[in-house]
Design a protein with these regions (language model features):
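Class I SAM-dependent methyltransferase SAM/SAH-binding core
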Residues: 1-35
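C-terminal lobe and adjacent flexible extensions of AdoMet/dcAdoMet transferase-like proteins
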Residues: 134-141
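Conserved Rossmann-like nucleotide-binding pocket used by diverse enzymes
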Residues: 2, 29, 47-48, 76
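A short acidic, Gly/Pro-enriched loop at the edge of an enzyme's catalytic core
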Residues: 34-46
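A short glycine-rich, Lys/Arg-flanked "PGG" loop and its adjoining helix->strand segment in the class I
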Residues: 59-71
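A short SAM/SAH-binding and catalytic strip from SAM-dependent methyltransferases
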Residues: 45-57
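C-terminal alpha-helical "lid/dimerization" subdomain adjacent to the S-adenosyl-L-methionine
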Residues: 76-134
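Short N-terminal helix/helix-N-cap motif within the alpha/beta-hydrolase-1
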Residues: 9, 56-60
């Protein structure tokens, strides 16, 4: 298991938790998802939780995840999508953007599904309030 986050603090917290749980097969790296320090096809599974709405270069992040995923591999995760909950959309615009936690532009559930379908052989996507969840399978070629 390889964990990567832009925040060194988050990686430190993750390392501490892994140590408490005596996990031995986990490595931690601080880095940018828009320029992943891994070889093409390095991973069977890529999991991204609550990240894409915060990434400054979303296009690079989508490309890099696809690049490091093995043929037949799975990309899954969840993140905020606009247009599902007016109250959440307001909060994102007026609070999270101003604090730098979220960075536009944001996907809608529809635009996310279309984007993922251009890259992956199969895409399953759903929403729970303003969060989209997805499971994608990369083609074998």
């Amino acid at each position: 298991i390889t964990c990567l986050d832009y925040s060194a603090d988050m990686m430190g917290q993750a390392q501490e938790k892994a140590d408490r749980l005596h996990l031995k097969n986990v490595t931690f790296r601080q880095g940018d998802v828009g320029a992943l320090p891994f070889a093409d096809g390095a991973f069977d599974i890529v999991l991204s939780l609550n990240g894409f709405h915060a990434f400054p270069d979303k296009e690079a992040a989508y490309r890099e995840v696809f690049r490091v995923l093995k043929p037949g591999g799975t990309f899954c995760g969840c993140f905020y999508v606009k247009g599902e909950q007016k109250r959440t959309d307001w909060f994102v615009r007026h609070v999270y953007e101003k604090t730098g936690f979220f960075t536009p532009p944001y996907e809608t559930a529809f635009s996310l599904k279309k984007r993922l379908e251009k890259l992956y052989a199969t895409v399953t996507l759903g929403t729970v309030k303003s969060m989209a969840w997805f499971v994608c399978r990369k083609g074998l070629r």
